[in-house]
Amino acid sequence: MPVWVKPNRKVDVLEVMDFMRDHLEGTELDMSKDPGAGPYECPYRWRPMSFEVDGKEYVHERATATQQTGFTFVSQSRSWLPDAVGGILWFGVDDAASTVYFPMYSCSTRVPHAYAVGNGSMMEFTDQAAFWVFNQVTNFAYTRYNAIHPEIREKQKALESQYKTFVEGIDSGAKALFDKDRAAAIEFLTDFSCNTGNHLVDTWRDFYGY
């Protein structure tokens, strides 16, 4: 496989997010279609990846999206904007296929409480922490994947499209503010990033109850 490829057209940030969610769908190695997927077409294979049948060894391919993911992000750089405005990390926790990426401007001076170090841990559950909230929804989806994941996908696409639209307006406001007061622009973008991240986790917590 190549380390990188040059696309023949501009790639949208939402498309790159979807690249992160691949399980080889639509190929001969589609993990939702082989016997290991079971009746609910689950595209995940629990470790170990290799197994033996009748003395012959086999191995599952590793998909891009996996269940043991801590976090992923898509980095977006817009050269036509001031550096403080032009850089965004679209950040998500847990399995990329089920996460929702939200925009964290690169100039942000703090992170949302739901994503902050010390708010829960790998051994300490709290429904105020983004990872645990997303992990609950994702683990539930694994049990009946072809019935539950489409619901996640619909919600995911709606939120990410909404955030992309928000960013267009925030960019304009931040650029205008940046020209007058750099510190105020950075605080404006930090507030937007933190409020968006915290609100997302509140939304996803409610979604788990759905």
Where are these regions (language model features)?
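C-terminus-biased signal that marks the final domain/tail of proteins
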Residues: 1-210
